[in-house]
Regions:
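Active-site-proximal beta-strand/loop segments in catalytic clefts of secreted hydrolases
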Residues: 2, 24-27, 53-55, 184-188, ...
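C-terminal regions of proteins
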Residues: 193-305
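Membrane-embedded segments
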Residues: 2-87
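Active-site segments of SGNH/GDSL-like serine hydrolases
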Residues: 170-195
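Loop/turn elements at helix/coil->beta-strand transitions in domains of secreted/extracellular proteins
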Residues: 18-20, 45-49, 174-182, 209-212
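Secreted/periplasmic serine-hydrolase-like ester/acetyl group-modifying domain
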Residues: 68-178, 263-308
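Alpha-helical scaffolding within the catalytic cores
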Residues: 36-39, 163-169, 196-200
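Acidic-and-aromatic substrate-binding clefts and catalytic sites of carbohydrate-active enzymes
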Residues: 28-32, 157-162, 189-196
Length: 308
């Protein structure tokens, strides 16, 4: 879910608590994608705990219809051809699947958009040159809520489709022998009808599989979040909110799980560079947010070119 981009900054957690973390997210990803994301992650790492933001298991049928195709494309088109990609296409795509194997069928006319291609190639080259993401990756939305902003009321629920997606994810984790998964509701201002019942049901399913649930919506006072100034919108924290929530979540994880904070010199050097880059990035994000520029800033934004 996109909250993983905006609400949590891995280099800040490293500075605060000394552990490494590697967020993986696709904006508006629904729960059907999560099992393949877990399988892909498990190819590359064996973390002490997986943290799963639960919004993807709560989309309504209308929201899934509206957002599902774009999010599915964004995830599946990044995967190299592999057993996981084939399985993910089978799990997530209804109807014609050929273009998911042959992207040229979908994107053959992109030559008409040279600026789009140029920007994409530039971002890919920057990532290759560094060898890793400096912010793992973090996104700042330069906005804040005001008293006149309308807070949406959503009819989200753990309907049959969402429950099956959640169970499939849990079964995938169990089959891989993954012991620690924290399902988390990151802070939101959105109002969900039947809120208590929705999250009680979700928590009950998670506990069936022996996994954990934490609702940070209900801990905003403890986190110190301002309901207006720390939110970019009803769904996402801004930079000020992220700077509060990240250490809070880091402390929660350190208290509840056995996290490794002893690292090789190579890992320490990498994360020290990431933290230094992030510290240069934060004041710019803060200033843009105070000025309500509405910009979305990440490590590849031109304003940070000299920081690399």
């Amino acid at each position: 879910a996109s909250e993983t981009f905006t609400d949590y900054c891995a280099p800040l957690a490293w500075q605060h608590a000394g552990f490494t973390s590697y967020p993986l997210a696709v904006s508006a990803a629904q729960g059907t994608l999560y099992a393949s994301m877990l399988r892909e992650s498990a190819k590359r790492q064996n973390p002490s705990v997986y943290v799963v933001e639960v919004n993807g298991f709560l989309y309504t049928e209308a929201e899934r219809d509206e957002l599902g195709t774009a999010a599915t494309r964004e995830w599946l088109d990044t995967l190299p051809l592999s057993r996981n990609k084939v399985q993910a296409i089978d799990e997530c795509v209804q109807g014609d699947r050929l273009s998911y194997y042959v992207p040229l069928l979908k994107y053959h006319d992109n030559w008409r958009k040279p600026d789009l291609i140029r920007n994409s190639l530039s971002l890919q080259q920057q990532a290759r040159d560094a060898g890793y993401s400096y912010t793992k990756p973090f996104l700042s939305i330069s906005m804040f809520l005001t008293e006149t902003d309308e807070i949406p009321v959503r009819q989200q629920s753990l309907d049959d489709f969402n429950e099956q997606s959640l169970r499939t994810f849990c079964e995938t984790a169990k089959a891989r022998g993954i012991k620690n998964v924290l399902f988390a509701r990151f802070p939101h201002r959105t109002v969900i009808e039947n809120y208590d019942a929705v999250f009680a049901e979700l928590e009950a399913v998670v506990h069936e599989y022996g996994y954990d649930f934490a609702n940070f919506d209900t801990q905003m006072d403890a986190i110190g979040l301002d309901p207006l100034n720390d939110f970019a919108n009803a769904e996402h924290l801004n930079i000020f909110g992220a700077e509060k929530f990240t250490p809070y979540l880091a402390d929660y994880l350190a208290q509840h799980y056995d996290l490794n904070t002893a690292h090789s010199q190579a890992v320490t050097d990498e994360w020290t560079r990431c933290a230094a880059f992030t510290q240069q990035m934060l004041p710019v994000c803060e200033d843009n947010t105070r000025r309500y520029t509405c910009e979305k800033l990440d490590e590849f934004s031109p304003v940070f070119a000299d920081c690399h």
